[in-house]
A protein has these predicted regions:
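Feature captures the catalytic ectodomains and active-site-proximal regions of enzymes
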Residues: 1-143
């Protein structure tokens, strides 16, 4: 390694042990608000909510998950730059639906449907807002 070389080692995200796993199949009052199953990640979920049930969805979701997930509209999520800065991809509105929920604790919501129940739960995961996931080490090595 030459004298003017620096090697930097880091990670793109940390990991969080899963402490509690939920399934929306246990909450039909939330499911009835959706036009399709939740998607994306078990700690960063997107929801397509029926336009006439947005208020009910917010109330029902927050009643159950307020202490473990931060629910926000997609507009709020994007305005907080969770996906970074710069121009928005033209398909992002289709991809995200109209609500996003980010885990703030050690919990996940399994991405299950009645056709695909009982998926195995990993021991740890990422995509939440805990320090274990947001703070990563940076190692710099010089000669």
């Amino acid at each position: 390694m030459s004298d003017d070389t620096i090697v930097i080692i880091s990670a793109d995200h940390g990991h969080k042990d899963i402490e509690k796993a939920y399934t929306l199949l246990d909450y039909p009052e939330i499911l009835e608000c959706l036009t399709m199953p939740a998607s994306l990640e078990s700690r960063a979920l997107t929801f397509n909510v029926k336009e006439n049930m947005r208020k009910e969805f917010e109330e029902r979701f927050n009643k159950v998950f307020r202490d473990e997930f931060w629910l926000m509209t997609t507009e709020e999520f994007l305005s907080k730059n969770f996906l970074g800065f710069g121009d928005k991809h033209p398909k992002i509105d289709d991809f995200l639906g109209n609500y996003v929920a980010l885990s703030t604790a050690g919990s996940i919501i399994r991405l299950e449907t009645f056709l695909a129940e009982g998926k195995k739960v990993k021991k740890s995961t990422h995509c939440g807002l805990t320090p274990d996931e947001m703070e990563v080490p940076v190692i710099a090595i010089t000669k």
